[in-house]
Curated annotation (Swiss-Prot):
This is ATP-dependent lipid A-core flippase. The keyword Nucleotide-binding applies. It comes from the Bacteria. It is found in: Cell inner membrane. It comes from Psychrobacter arcticus (strain DSM 17307 / VKM B-2377 / 273-4).
Amino acid sequence: MSQAYQPDSTKTSAKKSSAVTLNPPKRKTLMRLLAYLKPYWWAILLTITGFAINAGTEIWIAKLLQYITDAINQNDQSKQGLFPFIIVMLFFVRGVGSFLGNYYTALVSRNLVYELRVEVFNKLLRLPSSFYLANPAGTISSKLIFDVEQVTAASTDSLKTLLRDGLTVIALMGFLLYSNWRLTLILFVVLPPILWIIRVASKRYLKLSKGIQATMGGVSHITNEVINGYQVVKNYGGQAYESKRFDEVSKKNLRQGMKIVVTNSINTPAVQLLMAVAMAVVVWLALRPAVIDDISAGQFISYIAAAGLLSKPVRSLTDVNQQLQRGIAAGESIFALLDEPEEEDTGVLSPALVGEIKLDNISLVYPDSTVALHDFNLDIRAGETVALVGRSGAGKSSLVNLLTRTLSTSSGQITLDGMPIEDIKLESLRAQIAMVNQQVVLFNTTVFNNIAYGSLAHKTPAEVEQAAKDAFAHDFIMQMPNGYQSEIGAEGLQLSGGQRQRLSIARALLKDAPILILDEATSALDNESEYYIQKALDNIMRNRTTLVIAHRLTTIESADRIAVLDGGRIVELGTHAELMQLHGHYAQMYARDFE
């Protein structure tokens, strides 16, 4: 059994964390994210080209101011018609560059979301039951929906800002150094304190981002619970309680979000203030006679304009730290899930099973030390029907999960037709076991697709129709608007409980497996439907090994043998008549059933 997946914690270490030099875990996460971008190198190249064009126009805007100012001072009329044309062309070229950069960044971003989301979903399909036992459904869905979107901030949105504004800063700084390198060196003086501010903010962003992820998982979890249990909520008047619970977790999310806003609201102005101080010193020095006498008015205006144009990209580069840390936190969460051990398949055999089952000294202990089965022994002949009865928690469902290898034994051996169950491939094993659960699972698709589900999709319409007839579902299906092609809605809630159960039985009948497991398959049916379904089940159970988990003992009197479970062991075993003569556990339960 795999190690249970641990949900994200809002706590984070205050150890080494830097926006400039990423610590090893953060660097590893970022490099892993960037690896997803390799197939889109051509789009990134076009993005760089576009933003390089955009950065180049920033220089020419500053340079154009020099030419215009000098032309005005010199009263040069020869270029009067040229400047408007240059202005229009500059902004046209700038627009082309921005389009290339923005479009191809978005293309990479949306494809990354698609690939990550599909990879996470496919990973969920391969994870063992222990993962789902350890994690609420809302937390899992939050990773698939919220965290994947957040990851794009680290890999594409941040990349866009770094390329666009980074190239702009490089271009402008190059222009400033070329124009007057002595004055420009003053701007580098404020670089260390700016990097220190970004480093401090980086630590806080990462911590708060993990907190937001945790609270979003709580929001999704509560929402899923209320939606799935809306009938209980309404029937027991739980609206106020659920509203309060949702409000509390939403407020936690709000507080975490506002803390990020506060951090960003302090971080950005602080960086801008340092830039303003540097700019003020540059202007003060530039206006000194020793400096200004050596340059023209146009050169002065051009230099100051270029220095002023630095403000916006520097601010954006400061803000990108927030996006980057948020994305890295989400990336750590997603990669932790993707690195989870998958359901182990040790099987190498794909036999055609007859249905002989042997359980030899089976024990099953859950991670919380709960003992579900202890030294459990049972031999089931091929074609035999064995009913499992007992109080809730006696180990009936655990036994079924062991047979499908949804769970693994703690000790002991299970064999099918004399072969250890671990030696049979999971796909082969599960293809030869049909199940009808008490909790019916239907999907938001057509009646036909719900019966011919998964590996049964190749079944013909005639086979599906026959299975429905055997389950006494054909008549109500034909009364639906589009017959077998009718949509049944989410979880089949448009159908009655009996109708939903009959579709589930039809699915099991269509599978035609040598081993059949019925978890109180008639529990949701009315008396008349139960009579016909029981007859259909009697037919399908013939010549098949059948395990029946029974809650109403009147439904399993005809079983070949009845095993009474208590405390994870068999305390009584025999036919209905034999067990009644013992006047033990079974007889007492049977009497209570009638009462």
